[in-house]
Amino acid sequence: MKFSDVVDALERLERTTSRTQIVAILTNLFKKVIEENKDIIDKVVYFIQGKLWPDWYGYPEIGIGEKGIIKAISLAANVKEKEVEGLYKQLGDLGLVAERLMAKAPKGGLMMFVKKKEELTFEKVYETLKRIAFMQGEGSRDLKIKTLAGLLKEASPKEAKYIVRFVQGKLRLGVGDASIIEALAHVAGTTKDVVERAYNLRADLGAVAKIAVTEGPEALKRVRPKPGVPVRPMLAERLNDPKEILKKLGGKGLAEYKYDGERAQIHLLPDGKVVIFSRRLENITRSYPDVVQYAKSGLKAKEAIVEGEIIAVNPETGEPRPFQELMRRRRKHDVALAMSEIPVNVKLFDIIYVDGEDMTNKPLPLRRKRLEEVVEESEEFSLSTAKLVSTPEELEQFFHQSISEGHEGLVVKAVHDKSVYQAGARGWLWIKYKKDYKSEMVEPVDLVVVGAFYGRGRRGGTFGALLVAGYDEKRDAFATVCKVGSGFSDEELARLPELLKPYISETKPPRVISNVKPDVWVRPALVAEIIGAEITLSPIHTCAKDEVSAGSGLAIRFPRFIRWRPDKGPEDATTCGEIVEMYKSRLKKVEEPT
């Protein structure tokens, strides 16, 4: 397939923010792929996602930094590196630099007698970039740069622009998974729900695309969990009233301790190998060799996928330690030392698959029973503490028991016949009830950083505040909620430039909906936990714009930073719909007669 066909689609995607147009452009591109070579549909999907393969594969990245790209452009365009650097300062986009310089590259002399070069194919671009990624060892940096330069020489100026942006990790398309799923549904002749279900059970959108176009919609319906391939996790809603929680769940529920740890999906493969995925579907197996051993000893099955929480514990008392301790352990290079300093326990709460049986369509009581059968419990590897509750008093009492033992609160789960495992979905089958929700402040929310403001005075030289947004599921975009500048320690403020640097954008990212213009735009990637005084109507912020009141969105008053949430991706952030529910819930309480 001609790479120019893909590039034409990328260019059109870059020019629009309309969800309808994005889906139409993707649909036409996928139809073209099916006509030309349907076997590459998975790779085209990955390319649009800005990657060569899903992150959880654990394969190497392309591994060429900014300086290396500058050198590759200079080699390809036959100009000095200083000229590339100067133009980069002027344009702020290495892709545009490559496009301009390749358009001016010398074509006279001997080149006049050379046969016109063949059009570059997508297959060649992908395979070359893949080859670059796997170049390792001594001399690999120079080889990577020369290989990239060779690819740029074969490309048209416009193609060079997108190759460079891809290598730099800055495609700037504004395309989310939801838009790709909708387009795949169109070309496969099925519904969005069918594609989404398959993706939720097998978190590899390229692989799902290949099933859709090579095997058809019926094959998509047969997709089930597969050990070694992460399942997109089920998510919980939130409420702060025991009566409302039980009402939502149909009168009773299974209340489980909510642990302050790292959610983990533990896969036992038929060959006895254990793989661990984080909530963000990252392969974190190397960080937890102790958990690997717990699973090998404690899972009595040939193959299984179970879910639980990895919690840091005090080695002397066995009491839980904060989530930050776990993240500190993850950052340590000496894993053996980290294991001794910060030991962990695993609290299991669900089973997704076991010995050929898909458990996601089974109600919770059956899944819990099967989990009990499969797990041989030990002090380090056991089921979550849980209790069946049917009255607000029972729920409240169990909540305080959880708090007194050093945990966050409860997750209360439906136990009726339809209490299935909704992979990748947030719904009212699971409801969080945390201690933070008992305060007079608004519930803490997880928001995505989309901009930053320079600090003044004591904060000079770094950023003093962040623009944060909720996830707008309807538009597959990020809508602003507030500007947060308090709650940061001096150390956290000092780290902000380094933390934000990989995500800084010269222009507003396509998926960001904002009336506020920060000093620096930030591509949606980092998630922060924020708390505030209340949720109010706002003529400035765009979260839930026009949904509650015409012309107004919702904002958080007096927001305060609590902590970073490295375990969450941008689409895992609190949704604008959830913020609307929080606003209405608070409003209802204010309006209730005393």
Swiss-Prot record:
Species lineage: Archaea, Thermoproteota, Thermoprotei, Desulfurococcales, Desulfurococcaceae
Q: Which residues bind ATP?
A: E256, R263, R279, E309, F349, R426, K432
Q: What is its EC number?
A: 6.5.1.1
PROSITE patterns attached here?
DNA_LIGASE_A1, DNA_LIGASE_A2, DNA_LIGASE_A3
What residue ranges are annotated as transmembrane? none
- Keywords assigned by UniProt? ATP-binding, Cell cycle, Cell division, DNA damage, DNA recombination, DNA repair, DNA replication, Ligase, Magnesium, Metal-binding, Nucleotide-binding
From which source organism is this entry? Ignicoccus hospitalis (strain KIN4/I / DSM 18386 / JCM 14125)
Reactions catalysed: ATP + (deoxyribonucleotide)n-3'-hydroxyl + 5'-phospho-(deoxyribonucleotide)m = (deoxyribonucleotide)n+m + AMP + diphosphate
Which family does the UniProt entry place this protein in?
Belongs to the ATP-dependent DNA ligase family.
User: Which EC class heads this enzyme's classification?
Assistant: ligase
- How is this protein named in the record? DNA ligase
User: Active-site residues?
Assistant: K258 (n6-amp-lysine intermediate)
Cofactor(s) needed, names only, are:
Mg(2+)
From the UniProt record, which GO molecular function terms apply? ATP binding; DNA binding; DNA ligase (ATP) activity; metal ion binding
